[in-house]
Regions:
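Targeting-peptide/extracellular-domain and disordered-appendage signature
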Residues: 1-170
Length: 170
C-alpha cells in the first residue's frame, strides 16, 4: 500500500469531534452483506453531543444482525457516558465502554433487555477510501453529514453471537 493511501486512510478514519458546543454526531460503522444469501450485520460506534450541551455527550453502540432466511432481524443499542469512551484524532481507534474498533479489528457486546449481541471481527483488504461527496466538502460545515466508505469491499472474518447463537463470519 502506498504512503499516500495509508495517510488518506488514516486521516479519513480519525475523529473530528473536539467538544464543540454547536452539537455533533460522528459514527464509525462496519457492515457486511453475505455475497449470495440474505444475511448481513451492521455495527456502529457513535459520538452524540447535543447542541449547546457538550457536557451531555455520550457514546452510542448499535448492532443489528439481519437474517433474511429466517426473517429474523435482531437489534440492540446502548448509551455509554462519554467519560467511558475514547475516539482517536490520529487513526481509527474508537472505544465505547468495553467495545473497541481499531484498524482491522472490532470487538464488543451490547445487552438491551433480553437481547444480547456480541462480536469479534477482523476486517481488511478493501479498496481505497470512497468519498461520496467532493473532497473539499469534508472540511466544511455544509453539508452536516459527510459519508465515506473507508474500506469498500473489505472482507470480514470472526464471529457474531446473537442471543446465544454463534455465527461464523468468513
Amino acid at each position: 500500500m502506498s504512503g499516500e493511501r495509508m495517510a488518506l486512510e488514516k486521516s479519513c478514519n480519525s475523529t473530528r469531534y473536539a467538544g464543540q458546543a454547536e452539537g455533533h454526531y460522528e459514527s464509525f460503522f462496519i457492515r457486511a452483506n453475505h455475497p449470495s444469501r440474505p444475511l448481513a450485520f451492521w455495527i456502529r460506534y457513535t459520538i452524540f453531543s447535543p447542541k449547546g450541551a457538550p457536557e451531555k455527550a455520550v457514546g452510542e453502540l448499535w448492532a443489528i444482525r439481519f437474517d433474511g432466511e429466517r426473517n429474523r432481524h435482531v437489534a440492540a443499542k446502548s448509551e455509554i457516558p462519554f467519560s467511558d469512551c475514547s475516539f482517536s484524532k490520529d487513526a481509527l481507534a474508537v472505544r465505547v465502554g468495553g467495545a473497541e474498533m481499531v484498524d482491522g479489528h472490532a470487538v464488543g457486546a451490547i445487552t438491551q433487555g433480553e437481547t444480547r449481541i456480541s462480536w469479534d471481527l477482523r476486517f481488511g483488504g478493501g479498496g481505497p477510501p470512497l468519498f461520496l461527496l467532493p473532497r473539499n466538502l469534508y472540511d466544511k460545515r455544509f453539508p452536516a453529514a459527510k459519508s465515506l466508505v473507508s474500506q469498500p469491499m473489505a472482507r470480514f472474518d470472526g464471529r457474531i453471537v446473537v442471543d446465544g447463537e454463534e455465527i461464523e463470519i468468513a
